[in-house]
Amino acid sequence: MSAALLSLVQWLSPAFPTGAFAYSHGLEWAISEGEVRDAASARRWIADVLAFGAGRTDAILLAHALRGHDPEALADLARALAPSAERLRETEEQGAAFAATVAALTGRDLPPRPLPVALGQAAAPLGLPVAEVLALMLHAFAANLVSAAVRFVPLGQTEGQAALAALHPLIEEIAAESAEAPLDAIGSAALRGDLAAMRHETQEVRIFKT
């Protein structure tokens, strides 16, 4: 395994201080309303977000950031794609924490930007295949949502890992497609996930930020 790949794995690890564990992407509301109630429904909900929501849009943004597209233009697009105030906060807060930590580790100047753009800027010099970077990012995103489901549904640890493993083919497919997608192919249709994120903003009792 190359040093570059090890760096990327470290940056996308749950131990990396982006605070990802505190964000459920609206999943907490879906669980509280009974839409997600077991491993099968959790897997379907996460699969929809990956294929039709932030998973795909972030993957396309990341691919273009890796290829040196104007980071400010990508950051503006990432903000515009956030369907709710909490989703915007989720990508901006994690992106800022990610950039600050990588900058401290590497000495590079990495301004705070939405997470997929910040990750793309940081990872571009690693020279890794674009689809590989996208797949690892999508896996980290899915793993964080599975972890939220394990804690809040709750699911057993083995159930959670089985759900994550079942998402691997979809992650590979989205990564391969997004690596070649033009920027104007970006778009979202994960309507239930977006509504969940909006309704989470007024949820009275909650343990996640989003």
Curated annotation (Swiss-Prot):
Protein's cellular compartments: Cytoplasm
Top-level taxonomic group: Bacteria
Key words of the record? Chaperone, Cytoplasm, Nickel insertion
One of the Pfam families matching this protein, by short name: UreF
Family named by the database record: Belongs to the UreF family.
Record Gene3D superfamilies: Urease accessory protein UreF (1.10.4190.10)
**Assembly state and interactors?**
UreD, UreF and UreG form a complex that acts as a GTP-hydrolysis-dependent molecular chaperone, activating the urease apoprotein by helping to assemble the nickel containing metallocenter of UreC. The UreE protein probably delivers the nickel.
What cellular component GO annotations does this protein have?
cytoplasm
Instruction: Name where it mostly resides.
Output: cytoplasm
Q: Which residues cross the membrane?
A: none
One Gene Ontology MF term: nickel cation binding
Q: Which InterPro entries match?
A: UreF, UreF_sf
Q: State what this protein does.
A: Required for maturation of urease via the functional incorporation of the urease nickel metallocenter.
Q: What is the protein name given in its UniProt record?
A: Urease accessory protein UreF
